[in-house]
Each structure stands twice: as C-alpha cells, then as structure tokens.
Amino acid sequence: MSSSPSFGLLAVAALLLALSLAQHGSLAATVGPRVIVVGAGMSGISAAKRLSEAGITDLLILEATDHIGGRMHKTNFAGINVELGANWVEGVNGGKMNPIWPIVNSTLKLRNFRSDFDYLAQNVYKEDGGVYDEDYVQKRIELADSVEEMGEKLSATLHASGRDDMSILAMQRLNEHQPNGPATPVDMVVDYYKFDYEFAEPPRVTSLQNTVPLATFSDFGDDVYFVADQRGYEAVVYYLAGQYLKTDDKSGKIVDPRLQLNKVVREIKYSPGGVTVKTEDNSVYSADYVMVSASLGVLQSDLIQFKPKLPTWKVRAIYQFDMAVYTKIFLKFPRKFWPEGKGREFFLYASSRRGYYGVWQEFEKQYPDANVLLVTVTDEESRRIEQQSDEQTKAEIMQVLRKMFPGKDVPDATDILVPRWWSDRFYKGTFSNWPVGVNRYEYDQLRAPVGRVYFTGEHTSEHYNGYVHGAYLSGIDSAEILINCAQKKMCKYHVQGKYD
C-alpha cells in the first residue's frame, strides 16, 4: 500500500525543519539536557561531577574558550610550560586535608616544590641597589607579624553581624599609630608581600574580619607548594572531568559530547518552567536548571544577559564583592645574574612606589637551567601594565633589575610573558577578594540561586574564596543545593553564613 502524496510532503517538511533546527543549534531548545553548566573551570567541572554522581547525568557543559580549566591554564614560554594563573596548592600540612593536595601529590604526582619564605629578611633589595641589613629587615618583619597577630585577636572580638568590621589598614593604624600604615620602602614591601601578594588588593580595601586569620591556612596548614609540572596544574581539572566525561584513552582528550568548547554564553532566560541559554553563535539550549560558574568579573560585566534581570539583592551582592587582578610576569634571560642557593628563591624590591615590581621568584629547583625569573604585580599596577606594550613593561623591569644589581652585567630579557586576565572578557580578573563592609550574610547571597539559575565559583566559597580548593568545594556545595531541589523538592534556599 503506497503512502499518500500529502503524507510524504509532510514527512519531507518535518525532516527539513529538523535539519534546519539542528544546524542552528536550536533543536536543543525543545529537548535540552536537564542541567546546563556554564563554564568548565574548576568549579564548573566539580559541580558537574557531583551532579553526575547524584544521577543527574543529562548534562551539557558550555565553555567559552577552547580548553577546560579556566584560570588553571598553562602555556609554553621559552621552551617550558608555565602557569598563567593558579600555581600553588595553598594550605598544606595542617589539621585538615586540603582536597587538592592528594590529587596533586599522590594521584597525579605533579612536580611540586614547597615555597620557603623563611629567608626573605636577607633578600630585600634597596631601590638604589644592594640589600638591606638582614637584622633590620627581620625586625620590621617581626613588627608586621606582631601587628597581624593583634589583628587576629581584634578580628575575633568583632560583632558577628559584621557591623564592626574594618579594613586591614584601619587595624594597622590602630596598632602602629601611623596614619598611613606602613610607609617606608621596607615596611611597604613587607606589607605588600604579606597582604597584596595573597589577596591581590591592598589592606585599605580588604576586610579584617573575613580574612584575618585566613581559613585556608587555619584549616589546612601554613605550607604552600608550587606546581611546576609540564602537564600543568590544569591536569587536576582534566582528572576530575575524566571521572564522568568520556575521554580518549590514547590522547587523553575529552570526547564526550556533553562538553562543548568555544561556546560563549550571552543570554540566560529563566522562568518557573525552565531555562534557555543562548550562545554567541546563536545556538539555543534549554534545560530544567542552569549552573553558572562564570567568574565574578564576568558576572560584573555585560557578557551574560539575564532575562528577566537578576533581582536587586543578587545584583548588589555581585557588585559589592571585588574581582582582584594578580599578574605573574615571566622573563627569560640568556644567563643568570641573580643569587642562587638555599634561601634565595624569593626576593623583594623595596621601592618607594608601593607595589612596583616588588615580589620576585627564581626557579633554580623548578626549572633548572631555564634562566627564568618571575615578578608579580597586582591591582592597579596590573591594570596599568595590561594596557601598555610588553616592550614597555620589559623596559621598566630591566631598569628595576639594573638598580637591584648595580655591580652585575645584567643582560636584556630575551622573552617576556605578561598575562592579561583583567582584559580578557571571559575572566575580567584572577580571583575574588573580600572587601571591607560586606558581611557573611551578604556574601552568601552570591551563592544563592535565583529561581532555576544556580551559581558556583571560587567567589561563592564560604571560607576559601580566591583559591583552587575554594573553587573545587564550591562546585560540590552548589551542586548539592541544586540536587536538593531537583531530587528532594527542597528548593527554598535560606541565605546564611557562619554568623547565623
């Protein structure tokens, strides 16, 4: 029995429509995965892993770049792989186990080295050359340490509501009786090393109550380990992803269709019935829920439009918190001219201009014979440097090095690497910092879902914002919130924090 012509035409029309929808990425808008994860950095991969473990396997991960890992990303520099972003496992050898440490040190066996800052007093260079007297510097370090200890005691007495919070600088003024805080070149560079080198913002903007003491070190230990493995620190993210995403055994490449790279999310529509996500290539995907793991800097930008707009309380939480900038500048030289040996890995440049190429690291152990130095800048210096040419930055650095080592024949650097996280629209900075005036309740609003839109990222980690382990743990925590709603119908989120 033959089909009627009208039925055949309908079938052809339906087929053409399906092909057209599939070509434009819109077919997914009618069937869609249950959960879309925006971003394949540590928190996004961690969240998707926890969802998968809970039986939510109909996932789609949309990543804006051509790789996973986010701010954990290596690049080749002068023949060696170095880390553009996260580099350390911070918080090791304490009472609790940092969840990243066993993956790095035991499972993957990534090359890592304990960073030893105990000898800084003998490695502080004057602005006009030579080193400061070690005893003098040691006394200034001990003074800074004692002021910080007084700050810890003061922090513990502040009202749980956060109403009495103050900046770290205000605390320093109270204890040092100096109106501007540390003011001499040595005091400023020690201060910069203690705070800016950790938080990427100065003490005048950083919350005392929420950063002193720092939970990362109180919980996990004071030691930090520098990852210097040619596989990259990002190998941790690939390892986690490989536990639930299909991976090619030979190449190690993720081949699971649930991970889509080069998908720049530009719009998220949400309603009581579900979510729709649109990407820059005009693909459209629908789901029951969306987990947004984009950085705080991206949320503060106009890259992703939410429809309807996020409620005022959510927007205020996003804009109240700080997205800091931490820039690691690598330089390659034809030969070494700096001191090496025990206690020489880290050295400081005590400029009269606070934060001007102040913290240096040499890699005798990590990259032997590579002749590479690393200098770190943050905050306004980072933003300034991102907007000038690498040649101009190199010229500034060479001038500093020749001041530090006036008796040496200091050659020009042959290569320079200047990451530009602040300028990158997919990050808009490196990690979050807790500013003064934001209490724990307001902070937890960063993590709180809005309808079917959930949020994760290091900036949503209750105790460990700014750290790799914070991103990892926040992914798990945010996934649990979504699981409670999707599987247990416990969808009402109570904004809370340690103050409750």
Curated annotation (Swiss-Prot):
Subcellular location: Secreted, Extracellular space, Apoplast; Secreted, Cell wall
GO biological process: polyamine catabolic process; spermine catabolic process
Listed EC numbers: 1.5.3.14, 1.5.3.15
Catalytic activity: spermidine + O2 + H2O = 4-aminobutanal + propane-1,3-diamine + H2O2; N(8)-acetylspermidine + O2 + H2O = 4-acetamidobutanal + propane-1,3-diamine + H2O2; spermine + O2 + H2O = N-(3-aminopropyl)-4-aminobutanal + propane-1,3-diamine + H2O2; N(1)-acetylspermine + O2 + H2O = N-(3-acetamidopropyl)-4-aminobutanal + propane-1,3-diamine + H2O2
Alphabetical list of InterPro entries matching this protein: Amino_oxidase, FAD/NAD-bd_sf, Flavin_amine_oxidase, Flavin_monoamine_oxidase
Record's keyword terms, sorted: Apoplast, Cell wall, Disulfide bond, FAD, Flavoprotein, Glycoprotein, Oxidoreductase, Secreted, Signal
Glycosylation sites: 105
Binding site for FAD: 42-43, 63, 71, 87-88, 265, 427, 458, 467-468
A cellular component term, taken from the record's GO annotations: plant-type cell wall
Predominant subcellular localization, coarse grouping: secreted
Family designation: Belongs to the flavin monoamine oxidase family.
Summary of the function given for this chain in its UniProt record: Flavoenzyme involved in polyamine back-conversion. Catalyzes the oxidation of the secondary amino group of polyamines, such as spermine, spermidine and their acetyl derivatives. Plays an important role in the regulation of polyamine intracellular concentration.
Protein name per the record: Polyamine oxidase 1
Origin organism lineage: Eukaryota, Viridiplantae, Streptophyta, Embryophyta, Tracheophyta
